[in-house]
């Protein structure tokens, strides 16, 4: 425990909160180019083939981003937009690809939560 004199000499430092998405560099979204599109398996109690992409961002980072929704049209050299948001059962995946922007198509035949998957309103 510091003495009063030590506290006068140098005040206590506030610990700065570390960001959970450093590659975004304080921006809400970032553009990037897919360098690899592949599937990976989740952590222990879950079982699936999750679709992910390795993305080289305009901020210079290369990150792994999750591709949400059923079916996608992404391949190498596709230009995508990413946002923050981790996938709990995929270690190291801290970003989501935004569906329906740039080269990423929206989810086909989506009726609910359409805005999250870039799907247009179906014709009545």
UniProtKB/Swiss-Prot annotation:
The modification 3-methylthioaspartic acid is found at residue 89. The keyword ATP-binding does not apply. The keyword Magnesium does not apply. Keywords: Methylation, Ribonucleoprotein, Ribosomal protein, RNA-binding, rRNA-binding, tRNA-binding. One of its GO terms (biological process) is translation. Residues 113-124 have a biased composition (Basic residues). Transmembrane segments: none annotated. One of its GO terms (molecular function) is structural constituent of ribosome. Residues 8-30, 103-124 are annotated as: Disordered. One of its GO terms (cellular component) is small ribosomal subunit. Pfam families: Ribosom_S12_S23. Signal peptide: none annotated. PROSITE patterns: RIBOSOMAL_S12. With S4 and S5 plays an important role in translational accuracy. Belongs to the universal ribosomal protein uS12 family. Part of the 30S ribosomal subunit. Contacts proteins S8 and S17. May interact with IF1 in the 30S initiation complex. This is Small ribosomal subunit protein uS12. It comes from Trichodesmium erythraeum (strain IMS101).
């Amino acid at each position: 425990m510091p003495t009063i004199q030590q506290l006068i000499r140098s005040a206590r430092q506030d610990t700065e909160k570390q960001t959970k998405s450093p590659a975004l560099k304080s921006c809400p979204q970032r553009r990037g180019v897919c360098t690899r599109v592949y599937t990976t398996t989740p952590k222990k109690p879950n079982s699936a083939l999750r679709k992910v992409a390795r993305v080289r961002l305009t901020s210079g980072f290369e990150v792994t981003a999750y591709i949400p929704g059923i079916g996608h049209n992404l391949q190498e050299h596709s230009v995508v937009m990413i946002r923050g948001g981790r996938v709990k059962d995929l270690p190291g995946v801290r970003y989501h690809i935004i569906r329906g922007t740039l080269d990423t198509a929206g989810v086909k035949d989506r009726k609910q939560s359409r805005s999250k998957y870039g799907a247009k309103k179906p014709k009545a």
